[in-house]
Amino acid sequence: RGLGDVYKRQDDMRPTPEMSFAIRHLGCQSGIILTASHNPKEYNGYKAYWDDGAQVLAPHDAGIIDEVNNIASAADIKFQGNPDLIQIIGEDIDKIYLDMVKTVSIDPEAIARHKDMKIVYTPIHGTGMMLIPRALKMWGFENVFTVPEQMIKDGNFPTVISPNPENAEALSMAVN
């Protein structure tokens, strides 16, 4: 199903892996995720995904860019789908996704033995805040701490230069 047939959107921020799951679970032809990923705010934009939930690759990527380059104005874009087919993705998909995630735990017994292990989590203002704390609780972890200043949705990433967790600076608030 393409945009002309069915349009599905999320009612709030969601992590990229959940969107990839939703594309496959709902049988969508493709999906678009508005994101900066783990890059600085200058990279805010979108990623296009195909029906397998993976990012669009060649040759489809070039075809999409060609179509985008043919648009002179946003006013030229016309939605030609049936509004009755619009479905908002929200808590229902969250539940299905988290139920699926729970089944892929490598060692549930190890988690049970170490459920009081101290875990510090920060989404660095990103979408992980929507599901990671819930997933950790669902798995049984009891000693989870978050970084409150970075649990605020903000695509400007005000507490870091870059939200890339590969940079030590991005995790300094969590470590301290």
Each model region followed by its residue ranges:
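Gly/Ser/Thr-enriched, mixed-charge loops and adjacent short helices
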Residues: N44-A170
